[in-house]
Every structure is written in structure tokens, then in C-alpha cells.
């Protein structure tokens, strides 16, 4: 396996390298024959999934809760990746799932996830979503007063009380479109008190952008106080949800800082420019379960939760998928430009979703040559196989150790979280990349295609 590095063709040095953290276990698989065999068999790009990593990440979050003596539950944010295998593992382990649409809810239930292990989020939920959520005993995050009335109507029709969290508009982000303001929250609590036959207020939640543990802890502390006030009104109010917002650490600090310091428009195809604020923070010193530990430590939150008897609910997506998958494209052709090349692969940037948020997925792709590599280092951007100028998988002129050739493979690392399928589309009637589940237990590697239930 050959990582991006070195000087490049035509005197261009390419963009500063940004290698993903080493992953010896996955590297051993990529160094073997399997990626090329799968490329031949599937006839196009594909995603590799490692569900054992998903389980380990979830267990790490649960371990932090136990370490802090805090009761809680981890819900996987389903929107982060549509693969069926994550639902299978949540169902078997009894972990929760965060859904925000009727299709997501049906899919989770179809895989055996229990209704009481589902939390339903998102704004202005459709009636069919609320109906099934109430019938199945899901926990519903109520985002608005009119939505609360819809929930009450569904509950009375079903003759079953709805389980709800009231979503708070965070004071630190007053312009968010999510949540109930202070006055609306008081109205909602009073309305729920009048409708005890149709609703159980189990607690509160919020939607908070960003990755600052102290900001999340502060918002969580306010929810604990809201629980105490709600109990005085006769509500159950024994849990809060702090959502996701747990960063993933893709690369080390040195490479990340050098990249931000040195990157400039001539490092990108067509002189494309990116402001550092456009990028996801690909290095985070406090990431994943460690970020939860930081949240619990800030403002004495863990102690406040224990003292108040309040459970902590989490809805991580990307953080549960850290190192749980990668994306593989086959090189279809290479052309030379002034000082760099343009590699065209057999898929599109619709399968690497960061590009469609006016940004760039930055961890270096890894070149898997079909034949023994030789030649000089080579800088190239990577384009998709569509007729769109904007279809760039990598605008950046990546430093490859040798000139890619048709039939070689490019592996984009750590793409399971939000990259694989958030914006996938069969544009040009190109097939959607299949997801290949790897079983690496017991020292052998077996694979199967990811499939929905009953397929």
C-alpha cells in the first residue's frame, strides 16, 4: 500500500500531506488481494464496513458513563450512515437508535430495534412518523408547540400515552431553527400537565452545533434544572439528551496544523480556494468517548446528574463510525496538466459527501497499484466519472508516491461517518456503490454485501 507523500510531477509539490491515523489492521486487508478482487467482482466503487469498530466505539461511550457513575443510553444517529449492519448490531446489543424520518423508523424496527430503544428527532415531524412512534413506544423529541398538539392527537387516537422530551432552544445559539424558546417551553409544560392521559414528559433535549464540551455541559446543566422544575409540576422528567457533537480525530496535530498553515489556492485544481473555516476539524485533541468524558467533567455535570437522578442520553453518529469504514474507487484514466495530473475514477463525489457542502474531504487517499509501483512522485486531483466540472472527489492536488494508472485503486480512509451515502445519487445511471461488510474476527477476513432486512 502506498500513501500520498513526496514531491510531484512537473515541479509541483502538491498540497501538504494529511495522512489519516495509522490503521495496521485495515492496512493488512488493503495490502492483500481482496480490494482488487472486490473491484473486479462489483464492477465499480464500493464501501468497506467494519462493524466491530462500531461496537467498540459504542462500548467506549458506555464505559465513560459507567466510569462517571451516570446512568444513560447511547443512541446511534442513523442519518450518519444508512448501512443495515449498524441496525443489526444495535438490535442485538440493545443499543438505541436516533431516527428523524418514517423510513428510518421503519428500517430500525424492521431490523429488530425495539420501539422503546428509539428516539425520534428532527423538526415538524410528519403524521405517519408520529403515529408509528407513538404506537411503538418511541421517545419523541418535541420541537414546537404545534408538533406537541399533533403528538397529543396521535396519542389519543392510539389510546396510548406518548413519551416525549421537550426540545429546548439553547440560549447560547438563539438563532437555531430547532427547539422551544423559554416562553414556549413554559406553555408546553403547562399543556402537558393538562393532558396527562396522553403524554409523559420524560425530560428535555437540545440541538447544539459545534464540538465545544464546555458549551454542551453548560446546556446540559440547564436541562437538569429544567427537570427539577418540571418534577415540581408533576412531570416525570428524569432524563436529558445532549445530542451528538462528539468530534472525530482523523489525523495528528502536526500534519493538521501544517496543512492549515500552508494550504493555498494553487494546491487545488482550477485554483479553488478554501478558507480554513470551511473544513471539518480533522484533528481534535478531545474526540469520541474522551469528548463525553470532558462534557461530564465540565461544570461538575456528572455529579449534578447523579444528585438529581437524571439519566444522560447521547446521539452520536460520526463518532460511533470512527475508523469503521472506507471508500474504494478504481482509476479509469489519468491526464497531465501544467505541473499536476487529473485522475478520473469510476464513481462520483456524490459518494464522498463533504464536497457537496462546499468543502473538501481532506484525509489523504491511499493508492493501491494494480502492478508493482515505479516512477516518480506525482501530484494529482481526483475527478468523478460525470460530465460536471464540479464533480471533484478531491480538488486538492494530492501527492501520490507514483503516477496512478488505470486499474489502480484509490482508498479514502475513515469515510463511514456522513461521507458514504448522505448525498448518493445514481446520476448518469451510475450504480450506487455497494457496501461490503468485513468480518475480521478470528484472524481471517470474510465479507458479505450489506443488505436491508428480508432482502
Can you describe what each PLM-predicted range is?
Residues 45, 136-142, 172-182, 209-217:
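Flexible, glycine/proline-enriched loop segments at strand-loop-helix junctions
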Residues 209-213, 218-455:
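C-terminal active-site-proximal or functional interface alpha/beta core segments in diverse enzymes
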Residues 80-82, 103, 124-126, 144-148, ...:
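Active-site-proximal loop/turn and secondary-structure-junction residues that shape catalytic pockets
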Residues 196-207, 406-410:
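Internal alpha/beta core interface subdomains
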Residues 144-200:
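Conserved anion-binding
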Residues 73-75, 96, 115-119, 139-141, ...:
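Structural preference for beta-strand elements that scaffold enzyme active sites
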Residues 1-142, 148-162, 196, 232, ...:
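A charged N-terminal "starter" segment
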Residues 54, 79, 101, 133, ...:
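Conserved, mostly hydrophobic/aromatic
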Amino acid at each position: 500500500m502506498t500513501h500520498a507523500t513526496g514531491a510531484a510531477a512537473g515541479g509541483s509539490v502538491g498540497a501538504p500531506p494529511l495522512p489519516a491515523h495509522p490503521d495496521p489492521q485495515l492496512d493488512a486487508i488493503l495490502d492483500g488481494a481482496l480490494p482488487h478482487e472486490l473491484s473486479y467482482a462489483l464492477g465499480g466503487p464500493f464501501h468497506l464496513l467494519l462493524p466491530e469498530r462500531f461496537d467498540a466505539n459504542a462500548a467506549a461511550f458506555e464505559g465513560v458513563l459507567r466510569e462517571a457513575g451516570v446512568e444513560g443510553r447511547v443512541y446511534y444517529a442513523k442519518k450518519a450512515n444508512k448501512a443495515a449492519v449498524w441496525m443489526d448490531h444495535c438490535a442485538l446489543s440493545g443499543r438505541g437508535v436516533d431516527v428523524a424520518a418514517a423510513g428510518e423508523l421503519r428500517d430500525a424496527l424492521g431490523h429488530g430495534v425495539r420501539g422503546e430503544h428509539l428516539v425520534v428527532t428532527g423538526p415538524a415531524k410528519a403524521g405517519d412518523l408520529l403515529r408509528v412512534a407513538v404506537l411503538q413506544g418511541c421517545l419523541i423529541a418535541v420541537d414546537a408547540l404545534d408538533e406537541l398538539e399533533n403528538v397529543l392527537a396521535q396519542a389519543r387516537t392510539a389510546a396510548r400515552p406518548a413519551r416525549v422530551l421537550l426540545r429546548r432552544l439553547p440560549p447560547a445559539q438563539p438563532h437555531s431553527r430547532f427547539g422551544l424558546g423559554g416562553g414556549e417551553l413554559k406553555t408546553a409544560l403547562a399543556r402537558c400537565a393538562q393532558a396527562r392521559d396522553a403524554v409523559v414528559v420524560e425530560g428535555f433535549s437540545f440541538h447544539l452545533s459545534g464540538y465545544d464540551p464546555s458549551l454542551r455541559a453548560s446546556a446540559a446543566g440547564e436541562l437538569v434544572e429544567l427537570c427539577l422544575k418540571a418534577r415540581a409540576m408533576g412531570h416525570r422528567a428524569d432524563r436529558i439528551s445532549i445530542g451528538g457533537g462528539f468530534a472525530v480525530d482523523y489525523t495528528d496535530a502536526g500534519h493538521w496544523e501544517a496543512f492549515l498553515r500552508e494550504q493555498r489556492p494553487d494546491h487545488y485544481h482550477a485554483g479553488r480556494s478554501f478558507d480554513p473555516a470551511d473544513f471539518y476539524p480533522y484533528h481534535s485533541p478531545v474526540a469520541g468517548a474522551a469528548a463525553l468524558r470532558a462534557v461530564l467533567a465540565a461544570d461538575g455535570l456528572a455529579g449534578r446528574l447523579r444528585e438529581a437522578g437524571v439519566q444522560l442520553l447521547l446521539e452520536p453518529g460520526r463518532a460511533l463510525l470512527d475508523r469503521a469504514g472506507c471508500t474504494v474507487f478504481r482509476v479509469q484514466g489519468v491526464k497531465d496538466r501544467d505541473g499536476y495530473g487529473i485522475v478520473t475514477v469510476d464513481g462520483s463525489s456524490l459518494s464522498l459527501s463533504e464536497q457537496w457542502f462546499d468543502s473538501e474531504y481532506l484525509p489523504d487517499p491511499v493508492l493501491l497499484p494494480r502492478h508493482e509501483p515505479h516512477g516518480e512522485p506525482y501530484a494529482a486531483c481526483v475527478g468523478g466519472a460525470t460530465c460536471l466540472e464540479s464533480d471533484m472527489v478531491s480538488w486538492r492536488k494530492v501527492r501520490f508516491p507514483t503516477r496512478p494508472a488505470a486499474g489502480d485503486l484509490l482508498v479514502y480512509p475513515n469515510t463511514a461517518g456522513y461521507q458514504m451515502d448522505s448525498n448518493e445519487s445514481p446520476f448518469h445511471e451510475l450504480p450506487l456503490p455497494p457496501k461490503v461488510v468485513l468480518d475480521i474476527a478470528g484472524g481471517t477476513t470474510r465479507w458479505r454485501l450489506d443488505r436491508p432486512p428480508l432482502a
